[in-house]
Amino acid sequence: MKWHRGRLTQTLGAMGLTATLTVAAQAAGQGDMLDLAPMPPAKAGNPAMIELGKQFFFDRRLSGDWGVSCASCHDPAKGWGDGLALSKGYPSMEYFRNSPTVLNAAHRKRFLWDGRLDGADPGTLARDMITEAHTMNMDGRLMQERLQQVPEYAALWQKWRNDDINGMRVFNAVGEFITSLETRNAPFDDFAKGDSTAITKEAQHGYALFKGKAGCVSCHNGPIGSDGKLHKTGVPEHPDVLNNPLRTITMLRHYATSGMPNYMSARSDVGAYAISKDERDVGKFQTAQLRDLKYTAPYMHNGVFDTLEEVVAFYNQGGGEGSALSPLTLSTAEQQALVAFLLTLSGDPLIVEDPGQPDMQPRVFGKN
C-alpha cells in the first residue's frame, strides 16, 4: 500500500518508532538510559482457569448469534490478530480499527488502541469485547445460561471452583488464558542475554540505531517494546473508514457511547480524545508493542501500512500531520538494518489448536 507524503507522514506514530532521541527521554527525568529487555519468565497461572479460558476463547456461543468467537479476530495462525487492516467485528458490521494481537497481554499497561482499559484487569478486557455490540454482542446473562448447559464446561468449572458458572468469572477465565500467551524464543532475547551470534550484524546495527540515531527506544522500551503511553504521530486515516458506511457508523457509535461531544461532526479517528474529552488527546494512540511483528501485519491502529519497510519510511520522514517528531535522516541501508532488528523481536509462532465446541445438553431442574 502506497501513501503520499502527507499520509505517510502520519503512520509510524501509532506503530511507534518515534524520532525523539533517548537523551531527550533522559532530560525529561527518566534516569538511566531506556532500553528493551528480554521477555521475563512466564508467571504461573491457574491451570484449570486457563483451560476453561481457552475453551471459552474459541467458543462461538460467547457471541450473540453464535457467529464469532474471540479467536475470530485473534487467530493463533495470524499472530493472534486477524491479518486485516481493519477488523470486521460482529457479523453484518464493520469495525474501524485494526485488531491487535493479544500476545503478551500480561505485560501491557493499558489495553486497546485508545488505552481505555487498565492492563492489570484482563477480565474487564474480555468483558468489554464480548459484550460490546460491534464485536461479539453478547448479553452476560444469556452467555451464563448457555455455558451452564454444556456438561463438559460444568465439569471443568468444578475443577476450578465449587460453584456454578458465573458471568464475570467467565470473563476472568478468558483473561487468564490471554495472559498466558507470551512471545518465546525470540533471537533478540538470546542476544540480550549475552549470545552475540543470536542476531546478524545488520540487526545489531539496527539495534544501535533503535537506541541512538532513530531514538525509537524513547517510546518502545521494556520487554514488549512499549511504554504504554499515548502519543500522536500523525498516522494517516484509512480511507475505508469514511468510504464504507458500516465502518463510519461503528466509529460514530463508539463516540456516542463514549459521551464524546459533537460526535456526529467527526470525520476522523480521534483516538483517546473520545475517552478523555481532553483536546490534547485528539489523534493520540497507545504505543504498539514490537513483539512478533513478523506475524502481525498490517501495522498501526488502522492497518494503513502493509510492511515494516513502510512503517520505517514513514517515521524516517518525521511522522504525519500534527506529529511532534523530527525526520530521522536514516539512509536506505540504515532503514533496512532497523527492519532487520525489529524482526528479531519475534519468537516462535505460538499455535494453540481450537479445542472445538462441546455439546450442549439442556439442564434438568427437577420435576414439574
From Swiss-Prot:
UniProt-recorded Gene Ontology molecular function terms: cytochrome-c peroxidase activity; electron transfer activity; heme binding; metal ion binding
InterPro entries: Cyt_c-like_dom, Cyt_c-like_dom_sf, Cytochrome_c_Peroxidase/MauG, Di-haem_cyt_c_peroxidsae, MauG/Cytc_peroxidase
UniProt keyword annotation of 4Fe-4S present: no
Pfam family, one: CCP_MauG
Record has Metal-binding as a keyword: yes
Residues that, per the record, bind heme c 2: C216, C219, H220
EC primary class: oxidoreductase
Full protein name: Cytochrome-c peroxidase IdrP2
Upper taxonomic lineage: Bacteria, Pseudomonadati, Pseudomonadota, Gammaproteobacteria, Pseudomonadales
